[in-house]
């Protein structure tokens, strides 16, 4: 079977197309940064380690990303006074502003790709992805 017909090769190409479109529309915000900001917005003061899943990264990579975001004024982090190993994260006013502007753009990029499928196909696609991830 030709490589172009392999499922994961096709998925990688699709992901690369989506990433290129994302970077074109939101050049100052990576998809992992966006996901982390959405998670923080959903739960202000979230513990830093709880963001690993949202960032789809390691603890070290997440810490580096949050440090860069903190330097840009997008997030603030505070240590737990009772346990200095724990850190909690909030969006700053600037982070909230950036995220509010990014959400409709991110949604439109996703819709550009998902819109190629009917509503029924989108449901099936999500079911299949969840099934493969949870197997």
Swiss-Prot record:
Coiled coil: none annotated. SMART domains: HTH_MARR. PROSITE patterns: HTH_MARR_1 (PS01117), HTH_MARR_2 (PS50995). It holds the Pfam family MarR. InterPro entries: HTH_MarR-typ (IPR000835), Tscrpt_reg_MarR-type_CS (IPR023187), WH-like_DNA-bd_sf (IPR036388), WH_DNA-bd_sf (IPR036390). SUPFAM superfamilies: Winged helix' DNA-binding domain. One of its GO terms (molecular function) is DNA-binding transcription factor activity. Keywords: DNA-binding, Transcription, Transcription regulation, Virulence. Residues 48-71 bind DNA. It comes from the Bacteria. Residues 4-134 form the HTH marR-type domain. Gene3D superfamilies: Winged helix-like DNA-binding domain superfamily/Winged helix DNA-binding domain. PANTHER family: TRANSCRIPTIONAL REGULATOR, MARR, TRANSCRIPTIONAL REPRESSOR OF EMRAB OPERON. Involved in the temperature-dependent positive control of flagellum-driven swimming motility and cellular aggregation. Regulates fliC expression by directly interacting with fliC promoter. This is Transcriptional regulator HosA. It comes from Escherichia coli O111:H-.
């Amino acid at each position: 079977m030709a490589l172009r017909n392999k499922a994961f090769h096709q998925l990688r190409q699709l992901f690369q197309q989506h990433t290129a479109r994302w970077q074109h529309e939101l050049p100052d915000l990576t998809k992992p940064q966006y996901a982390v900001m959405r998670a923080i917005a959903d739960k202000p003061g979230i513990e830093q380690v709880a963001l690993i899943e949202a960032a789809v990264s390691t603890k070290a990579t997440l810490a580096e990303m949050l440090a860069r975001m903190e330097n840009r004024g997008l997030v603030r982090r505070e240590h737990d006074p009772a346990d200095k190993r724990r850190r909690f994260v909030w969006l700053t006013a600037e982070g909230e502003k950036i995220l509010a502007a990014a959400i409709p753009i991110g949604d439109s990029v996703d819709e550009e790709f998902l819109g190629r499928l009917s509503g029924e196909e989108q449901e099936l696609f999500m079911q299949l992805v969840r099934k493969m991830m949870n197997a």
